[in-house]
Amino acid sequence: MDSRERVLASINHEKPDRIPCDLWAEPGVWERLKKDLGAESEEAVRKALEVDIRYISPRYPPDTLTNGVKQNMWGERWEKTSTIFGVEWEHTRGVLFDAQSVSDLEAFPWPTCDQVDYSHVAEDVKRCEGYAVFYGNADFFERPGLVRGLENIFIDVMINQDMVDYLQERFVSFFIEDFHRSESTP
């Protein structure tokens, strides 16, 4: 049973030959795993640990860096912080944290799929043959929480539902188009 078959068996409530394995890690953890396993790359770590899932995504525009704060196309922001594993990027207030109305949300320069490079997606899928493939990161709740602030999203659900609806529409529409474009790459 290969990794793809193993994950599909589990999803279908069938018994796999072993429990499927996945791995997400921060940069400091990847470095430690590479060192401890004598691995040259993250992919070598995945193979050594028999990780069954591979992640692919299109290439998004590069993050910007202003005054030590990194921001992506969605307005998610990170600041460097020291941890016991080294310096990591930690989420900080997103660009829409102080928005008070739908018009404030509308004023943000929302990204479009035209800014995204899909040219390598088909090749990445081929490279992952035999593995379960997870595409993209269409997180319709977490991402709005990162650009708006999770606490603000919870408050908005109670008293600013129009803002929640607007954010959900923006993200869902983007990711539906994103999936369609990734499917249609040669």
Can you describe what each PLM-predicted range is?
Residues 1-186:
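Catalytic cores of TIM-barrel enzymes
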